[in-house]
Amino acid sequence: MIDNNKHNQDINASSANTIKKDELSESACKIDSIIDPKDDQIIQLQIQLAQIKEHERNTILRLKAEIENIQRRNIQEIEKAHKFALDRFVSELLPVIDNLERTLGIIDRSNTTLSAIIEGIDLTLKSFLDTVYKFGVKSIHEIHIPFNPEIHQAISTMESEKYESNQVLTIVQKGYSLNGRLVRPAMVIVAKSKS
């Protein structure tokens, strides 16, 4: 009877195990059928998330590049502003330079009573020019060079056998540039060939 009971218990345990295994496998199938659509949805969401992250990363990179470009342009504009802030000031100083040069050109240097005044004007002009040259001002005063409409303004032409046509013969009024930018063109007389 003990053997029978043991045998019955084994059979009962075995059939209980089989029933549990069947139930588990049915549950697993149900879970699989439940999980599968959710897995697909999870995968789709992960793909969308990756795309959004990539788009966001690209947007951030683009914005960083745009910010760097704006900063670079601002720095360049500030440099230009510093470089050419003196433009108007230099334009106002040019008539003073012209007047000092004209004075030295017409004054009688042989008059000994004026020698101290002449020397004072000469030193003043030299000091004044040295000062403006320190700030990037350059004079345009070369003669016997080809006429350049970017830096010269022809006010007259003169026939010449000695110089080629379109050569600068005389500077009537010096021109000036500030850091490579023209402030005032040089007023010149240009050679033309004899007809």
From Swiss-Prot:
Listed A to Z, the keywords are: Chaperone, Cytoplasm, Stress response
Source organism's superkingdom? Bacteria
Record bears the keyword Cytoplasm? yes
For this entry, list what GO says about its biological process: protein folding
Q: What InterPro entries does the record tag this protein with?
A: GrpE, GrpE_coiled_coil, GrpE_head
Q: Does the keyword Chaperone apply?
A: yes
Q: Name one GO cellular component term.
A: cytosol
Q: Name one GO molecular function term.
A: protein homodimerization activity
Location relative to the cell: Cytoplasm
> Where the protein is mainly located, per its record?
cytoplasm
The record's note on quaternary structure and interaction partners says: Homodimer.
In the record, the note on similarity to other proteins reads: Belongs to the GrpE family.
Q: What does this protein do?
A: Participates actively in the response to hyperosmotic and heat shock by preventing the aggregation of stress-denatured proteins, in association with DnaK and GrpE. It is the nucleotide exchange factor for DnaK and may function as a thermosensor. Unfolded proteins bind initially to DnaJ; upon interaction with the DnaJ-bound protein, DnaK hydrolyzes its bound ATP, resulting in the formation of a stable complex. GrpE releases ADP from DnaK; ATP binding to DnaK triggers the release of the substrate protein, thus completing the reaction cycle.
Q: What is this protein called?
A: Protein GrpE
Organism whose genome encodes this protein: Blochmanniella floridana
Q: What gene codes for this chain?
A: grpE
